[in-house]
Amino acid sequence: MGEDSTGAGANGVDDGSRDAVRVRIAVRADVPAMVRLLADDALGAAREQLDGAIVAEYRDAFDAVDRQPGNELLVAELGGVVVGCLQLTVIAGLSRRGVTRALVEGVRVAAQLRGRGIGATMMRVAMERARAHGATVMQLTSDASRIDARRFYERL
């Protein structure tokens, strides 16, 4: 925990305040911001909730992910504010002579900040972390109805 990567220079993000996006391992205190990001479109709003007792369910889920080896929740910060998140899971496999895979899901960037390189920086960091864990294949899940997200992934 506590490791981070900064996307500066060509891969960084300039929001006018000279703050670069910083990608780091999520902590429990990030859960409300992450859920808000997950609910930041019509599909997510139908799936996610952030009120009262439900927050405890998300914190329990965070704890379960955090305890499971090979699972990482990453957040992107800009100016100290969480503006993106994703989940990276490293999976041992039998196929391809036992190749280790990485699965990326739950990728979100705040709607008002899309198109500024934050998602690309998050994916670059996820790929670096996956390689560091021995993964040689990376898979990504995305809902077919998220057309803009699919276009983004196709450009990577």
Segments the model singles out, each with a brief description of its role:
Residues 3, 11, 16, 25-99, ...:
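Acetyl-CoA-dependent GNAT
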Residues 110-112, 116:
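Active-site acidic-Proline motif in GNAT/NAT acetyltransferases
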Residues 116, 120, 124:
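Residues forming the Rossmann-fold NAD(P)(H) cofactor-binding site
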Residues 123, 130-142:
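Conserved GNAT acetyl-CoA-binding A-motif
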Residues 123, 146-149:
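Short glycine/proline-centered loop/turn elements that form peptide/ligand docking sites
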Residues 153:
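Conserved active-site tyrosine of GNAT-family acetyltransferases
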